[in-house]
Amino acid sequence: MKFLDQAKIYVKSGDGGDGVVAFRREKYIEFGGPDGGNGGRGGDIVFEAAGNLNTLIDFRYTQHFRARKGGNGAGSDRTGAAAAPVLIQVPVGTQIFDEDRETMLADLDQPGKRIVLCHGGDGGRGNAHFKTSTNRAPRRADKGWPGEERWIWLRLKLIADVGLVGLPNAGKSTFLSVVSAARPKIADYPFTTLHPQLGVVRLSVAEEFVIADIPGLIEGAHEGAGLGDRFLGHVERCAVLLHLVDGAAGDVVKAWRTIRHELEAYDGGLAAKPEIIALNKIDAMTPQQISSRRRALEKASGMPVVTLSGVTRQNLDDVLRLLQDRVTATREAARDAAPPQAAAGREETA
């Protein structure tokens, strides 16, 4: 399935139904009076976060969504039928922006979360509504109120516990394919991964986390160079970053600093996220190279550095356990800090 993380669409809620002019007509009742009913309410445009979706690709082919008009009123004071809402399902983590691409209207960050983005128009009033002591037979009825319409941008920020970052060819796709059931494209050239990939890592029945392989970042990624500007946003929701450094490529300190600079320059608080630095591809290095490059990384970063090999699976279990512990701690801290929330499926309004 193709990946698409942003889309522009048009949405319009339904117009309200029209009120009608009608009079009571029964045998032996010469002047029955007005009994025209009101129009029904137009359909709403509702967005819902669906846990089984992970791309906005469907919106490439369907870009216009319109709800139906409410039913017209009828005699005998009958109100027109309300139109059904149009439910638009999007992946969890989708943000809805106004046409200016800056004003956020909604953030659907929980499965089942809903928002009414455009409210249907109210129905027009029938002539029964306008009856007064001085106007016993009004012939006035209102048209339904128009619905709301707007162009909006959908922007998907994947929700993963761990974000894999590193320069192109750092071994991120290989790592993801080995530790999870994900099958990203793997080859020995830069930018093999053109779209974010998700995988689920299960250490036990009760322990699992979602890991995202973010396409390779390069110098200037935060300004749009390479593929990074588009995909740095996917890292924002991760609890911890696993920074893979290609140990066989040479200058490991420069590689680490390049990515750190891009994370710090991006305005999503990425630099403050917990980071685990891993010296990758130790199967292609001598013990002396592993030791010297590990020490150089630790000196430059001021942090402990783990070593691993995605190809030979060396030290993978230790790294996964470290990631799981960090993710668990972050989840517990977030749970303690979060205020009580209503059950999923609640509706909000934009």
Swiss-Prot record:
GO biological process: one example: ribosome biogenesis
EC number(s) on file: 3.6.5.-
Pfam families: GTP1_OBG, MMR_HSR1
Residues binding GTP: 166-173, 191-195, 213-216, 280-283, 309-311
Region (Disordered): 331-350
Record's subcellular location: Cytoplasm
UniProt domain OBG-type G: residue ranges: 160-328
Listed cofactors: Mg(2+)
Annotated keywords: Cytoplasm, GTP-binding, Hydrolase, Magnesium, Metal-binding, Nucleotide-binding
GO molecular function: GTP binding; GTPase activity; magnesium ion binding
Gene3D superfamilies: GTP1/OBG domain, P-loop containing nucleotide triphosphate hydrolases
Enzyme class label: hydrolase
Binding site for Mg(2+): S173, T193
Domain Obg: 1-159
GO cellular component: cytoplasm
Cited InterPro entries: G_OBG (IPR031167), GTP-bd (IPR006073), GTP-bd_Obg/CgtA (IPR014100), GTP1-OBG_CS (IPR006074), GTP1_OBG_dom (IPR006169), GTP1_OBG_dom_sf (IPR036726), OBG_GTPase (IPR045086), P-loop_NTPase (IPR027417)
Tree of life domain: Bacteria
Subunit structure as annotated in this protein's UniProt entry: Monomer.
Family according to the record: Belongs to the TRAFAC class OBG-HflX-like GTPase superfamily. OBG GTPase family.
Its job: An essential GTPase which binds GTP, GDP and possibly (p)ppGpp with moderate affinity, with high nucleotide exchange rates and a fairly low GTP hydrolysis rate. Plays a role in control of the cell cycle, stress response, ribosome biogenesis and in those bacteria that undergo differentiation, in morphogenesis control.
Name of the protein described by the UniProt record: GTPase Obg
Taxonomic classification: Bacteria, Pseudomonadati, Pseudomonadota, Alphaproteobacteria, Acetobacterales
